[in-house]
Design a protein with these regions (language model features):
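Terminal amphipathic alpha-helical/low-complexity segments used for targeting or macromolecular assembly
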Residues: 1-148
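Structural signal for interior beta-strand "rungs" in well-ordered beta-sheet cores
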Residues: 150-197
Length: 197
């Protein structure tokens, strides 16, 4: 037993610093809850509450990046600021275009709220859009943790390095794989069981 414990201790000492998947998963889910109240566990009805939650998330990302400098080649605070400065244009606006494509592209969709709350494709593309922005900022591992979290929940595996255009629609979702070298244009609709790249 002593030898086994020594092996485990060595493994723990050699493990590169990285935030726990639970920390990253919580960050992503909380961020998605701010962007889309349909995913929020709390109603942020007044601007003050929204600003506070937004600031908390920004600080959380700063802390994650500052404590894990091996995952990037920059300043954790600067990278977190860049992420939140680009969040509206690179994530929020594109997700609303994706939402529009999914709602209009699926005759069974009764409302955009249904797509946001129920469609695994929307959850997967949300994770991709967040992870892709982090990836473009030169942050490693964390983007992959986010897309793998979505993969475990949706059956959709999208590498954060893939290039996906605007108005992207994933219908049914299960069994979709989009690899790192994949380039998907604008206004593309993909059904279940498709591998690209």
């Amino acid at each position: 037993m002593e030898v086994f414990l020594n092996r485990l201790q060595k493994a723990h000492n050699l493990c590169p610093g990285c935030p726990s998947p639970k920390v990253i998963n919580r960050f992503f889910d909380d961020l998605l809850g701010i962007l889309f109240p349909e995913h929020s566990s709390e109603a942020l009805k007044d601007k003050g509450s929204l600003e506070l939650k937004f600031s908390e998330l920004k600080l959380q990302l700063q802390k994650i990046l500052t404590m894990n400098v091996a995952l990037h080649n920059g300043n954790g605070e600067d990278l977190a600021n860049q992420f939140f400065e680009k969040l509206e244009e690179e994530v929020y606006n594109k997700l609303h275009e994706d939402l529009d494509a999914m709602y209009k592209g699926d005759p069974a969709a009764k409302s955009k709220t249904e797509v946001i709350r129920c469609y695994p494709g929307f959850y997967a593309i949300s994770a991709y859009r967040v992870a892709h922005l982090l990836h473009r900022l030169g942050i490693s591992l964390i983007p992959r943790m986010i897309t793998e979290y979505a993969h475990s929940k949706t059956g959709v595996d999208i590498h954060p390095g893939a290039m996906i255009g605007r108005f992207f629609c994933i219908d049914h979702a299960t069994g979709i794989v989009i690899g790192e070298t994949t380039l998907v244009g604008d206004r593309v609709k993909i059904y279940q069981g498709v591998t690209l790249g």
